[in-house]
A protein has these predicted regions:
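A short, glycine/small-residue-rich beta-strand->loop->alpha-helix junction that serves as a flexible
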Residues: 8-18, 151, 263-266
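Nucleotide-activated donor-binding/catalytic signature segment of Leloir-type glycosyltransferases, i.e.
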Residues: 313-335
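Conserved catalytic-core segment of nucleotide-activated headgroup transferases in glycan assembly
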Residues: 229-318
Length: 494
């Protein structure tokens, strides 16, 4: 069967977001098409009231069933492909953040059904799922030459329904998602969402292709340049430094907040569906068991994230702080737009759920404490308070919150493998990786064979000294690798 690509939308897929994909389409004249007829449906984000007339027949279908959780269409369970987008809307509402709601399918469903407003929203999401399945089924019937479907994220109803039907028809599905650097992205063959579940979580081994030699130095420099060049498109770049309000010598812990309805939280089973409830518990544990002061950094993207459009996490954490005794209030700083790099320079530890900002914390030498699970858990450079109760006590050993050189080496190896094996740089020169991936479903989108052509950005000596001061772990690591490679090459051959 000849190759023909179907892009699920042109909302996410355009040249600015995925330049090498479009270069590959142009360079190799790859047959492709975009579904463009349902823009208002793509952007519903779990709110389908404005489409109720278009959904009339699907709503009637839903109303014929008593158990909304068990409805199927074309052998696809509607609740399974609707849950994530339903929560994308539900988690913008206050009553979902009271705490005690596990992020587990049955618990979420039962909580939604107990509230009339949520029940109606769920009913419409199920109707949308039914409608999308019928739409895609008819679309694919009319385009039997489609060999590959390419979707963004995989958590929206319109993408989940397409993925389910593509699986039935043996159509290969590639899921794309941005990495936190803003300059790299994932592109993986999969039949489920990619949020907080990229391939390296399931299929990863250290030193898989790069050995302790000059190539290792090049890979390290490449990973370093990608991290230094990061520009998270969801975080406004503001040069605002945090001013330390505490005059004591108590340790400072940074909690990195995420967008309340972020799919990386929604798609990860946990004890709490509400990130806000998890943050509150983390703050309570720090106040109760340590002398640490706490900086909570809310995510500025909440003001622009649909359908939230307000700083919900910041509002709820502020309300929580105001409910505490004054002596505890004085130990907490709530911020939003301040540079996270300026906070890394003064804090003694970092906590978070699954934010990829925790990887940036590792880059600065911290060993983050995870409140939840993430694709980089259990790799040797993060930790859990549940697994290490000595983390939270009055004596507070700062060394436990920092990476040892061996742990930093594991982080460096992980990031090298991420950038050279799992991620595609959003650059023209990476178009060949796209073609390689399309032609071989077992191939990893690997930049390793391009390492010889990579040139890291030039740095002024003042920039270099500043970076050594900020991140001594990284430079000790790179120096060690370079020295090893030189010693190895200087040994006489036998």
């Amino acid at each position: 069967m000849a190759m023909k690509l179907l892009f699920a939308d042109n909302w996410h897929f355009h040249r600015r977001n995925f330049l090498p994909i479009f270069e590959a389409l142009k360079k190799d004249s790859l047959p492709h098409q975009f579904e463009t007829s349902r823009r208002s449906w793509w952007k519903a984000h779990g709110r389908y009231e404005h489409l109720s007339k278009s959904l009339k027949k699907s709503i009637e279908f839903i109303d014929q069933h008593d158990d909304l959780r068990a409805i199927h269409c074309l052998d696809v369970n509607l609740w399974e492909i609707s849950k994530a987008e339903f929560l994308c809307s539900a988690l913008t509402q206050n009553h979902w953040h009271v705490g005690g709601i596990p992020n587990e399918s049955d618990s979420v469903f039962e909580f939604a059904m107990a509230n009339p407003q949520d029940k109606e929203a769920l009913r419409l999401c199920l109707a949308a799922a039914h409608n999308w399945l019928l739409f895609w089924n008819q679309y694919l019937d009319g385009h039997v030459d489609i060999s590959h479907a390419i979707v963004f994220s995989g958590s929206y109803i319109y993408t989940r329904s397409l993925m389910a039907l593509a699986k039935q028809r043996d159509i290969s599905v590639l899921v794309a998602e941005h990495f936190f650097t803003g300059n790299d992205f994932y592109l993986e063959y999969r039949d489920g969402p990619i949020a907080n579940n990229c391939g390296v979580k399931r299929d990863f081994s250290f030193h898989s292709c790069i050995k302790e030699n000059e190539a290792k130095v090049t890979a390290s420099a490449y990973a370093h340049s990608r991290m230094k060049g990061m520009k998270n498109r969801n975080v406004p770049q503001k040069n605002i430094s945090f001013k330390n309000p505490w005059g004591d010598k108590n340790p400072i812990i940074l909690i990195i907040g995420q967008v309340a309805n972020d799919f990386s939280i929604i798609e990860t089973p946990s004890d709490e569906v509400s990130s806000i409830a998890s943050y509150k518990q983390g703050i309570i544990e720090l106040l109760k068991n340590t002398k640490a002061n706490v900086i909570f950094k809310a995510h500025p993207w909440e003001r622009r994230r649909a359908p939230l459009f307000r700083p919900l996490t910041k509002i709820k954490i502020d309300e929580f702080i105001q409910s505490l005794p004054e002596k505890d209030q004085a130990r907490i700083a709530l911020i939003e737009n301040e540079s996270i790099q300026s906070i890394f320079l003064i804090c003694d530890g970092v906590m978070g759920i699954s934010s990829q900002g925790l990887l940036e914390a590792c880059y600065y030498g911290f060993k983050p404490v995870l409140i939840g699970d993430t694709f980089f858990s259990n790799k040797g450079f993060t930790q859990s308070a549940n697994q290490n109760p000595n983390l939270l006590n009055k004596s507070f050993d700062k060394k436990m919150w920092k990476l040892s050189l061996k742990e930093y080496e594991l982080f460096q190896d992980f990031m090298e493998s991420m950038f050279t094996e799992a991620l595609i740089p959003n650059s023209k020169f990476a178009s060949g990786l796209i073609c390689e991936k399309l032609l071989d479903s077992h191939a990893k989108p690997s930049a390793k064979h391009l390492l010889g052509t990579i040139r890291t950005p030039k740095m002024k000596w003042t920039d270099l000294l500043g970076d050594v001061y900020e991140r001594p772990h990284a430079w000790m690591r790179l120096s060690g690798i370079w020295i090893k490679s030189k010693l190895k090459s200087s040994k006489p051959s036998k």
